[in-house]
């Protein structure tokens, strides 16, 4: 997400920007950039709260202190169980019929005539209603999502159902391979702005939405804070190590 000092985000009047981050899994070993981004934005003065579709990838006792602290303050969408979730969804629909109807229309529009896709869309709708209610209770007024897959589908339905502005960080490559299955054009066009992790990612976004204006598109690369690393002592016969993924 852009640095708030030069972000395309804007709110009417003097309303304070309070951001919800919707992530697929938080914390997670392979998603350390989520943690660094959230902490970095908070250090810059942005009020950021996190919701995660799934629970952490490790037990709490196995989490580093900073990740355990984040987990304690993260809203986990699937944490209630089926029965309690069903009751909560019925309450949301009863108390906010307009929200439920807008969300249902958005979900069914995405599913088209594919029965399986519609079924998945209804699951995404359920999660979107829960996320929107959490945002309302926390007085959060902007939703940001990482990854362009199912979690972004939940984010888009949340925005449409609850009338909340939203944005997305796209990584690729999956969503670029099957744009229709990921509803990529709809996500790009409905988002307030789109963040790309590389110039190549940006070029793919512009292929999908060539009329997207520059003010709604930013490149923010994922990197490593070299200041946090200690160089190893030099060896006369160093070993070479090939890594598949850096986390």
Question: Which residues make up each language-model segment?
Answer:
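Conserved donor-binding/catalytic core segment of Leloir-type glycosyltransferases
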Residues: 237-247
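N-terminal subdomain of nucleotide-sugar transferases
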Residues: 1-83, 136-138, 164, 189-193, ...
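Active-site proximal beta-strand in glycosyltransferases
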Residues: 19-20, 141-175, 195
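Short N-terminal targeting/anchoring amphipathic segment
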Residues: 75-79, 95, 119-120, 131-149
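Carbohydrate-associated surface elements
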Residues: 200, 223
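Short, well-ordered alpha-helical microsegments
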Residues: 30, 151-154, 202
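A conserved, positively charged/aromatic
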Residues: 116, 166-192
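Extended, charge-rich helix/loop segments that form flexible
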Residues: 80-125
């Amino acid at each position: 997400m852009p640095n708030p000092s030069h972000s395309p985000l804007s709110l009417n009047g003097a309303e304070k920007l309070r951001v919800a981050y919707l992530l697929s899994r938080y914390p997670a070993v392979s998603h350390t950039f989520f943690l660094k981004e959230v902490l970095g934005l908070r250090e810059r003065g942005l009020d950021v709260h996190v919701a995660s579709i799934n629970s952490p990838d490790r037990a709490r006792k196995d989490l580093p202190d900073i990740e355990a602290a984040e987990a304690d303050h993260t809203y986990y969408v699937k944490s209630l169980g089926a029965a309690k979730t069903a009751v909560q969804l019925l309450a949301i629909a009863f108390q906010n019929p307009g929200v439920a109807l807008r969300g249902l229309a958005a979900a069914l529009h995405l599913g088209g005539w594919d029965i399986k896709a519609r079924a998945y869309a209804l699951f995404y709708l359920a999660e979107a209603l829960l996320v929107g209610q959490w945002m309302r209770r926390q007085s959060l007024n902007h939703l940001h999502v990482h990854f362009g897959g199912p979690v972004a589908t939940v984010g888009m339905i949340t925005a449409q159902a609850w009338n909340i502005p939203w944005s997305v960080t796209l990584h690729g490559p999956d969503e670029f391979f099957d744009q229709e299955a990921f509803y990529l054009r709809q996500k790009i066009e409905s988002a307030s702005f789109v963040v790309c992790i590389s110039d190549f990612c940006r070029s793919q976004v512009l292929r999908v939405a060539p009329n997207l204006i520059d003010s709604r598109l930013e490149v923010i690369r994922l990197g490593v804070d070299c200041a946090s690393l200690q160089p190893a002592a030099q060896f006369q016969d160093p070993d070479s190590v090939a890594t598949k993924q850096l986390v």
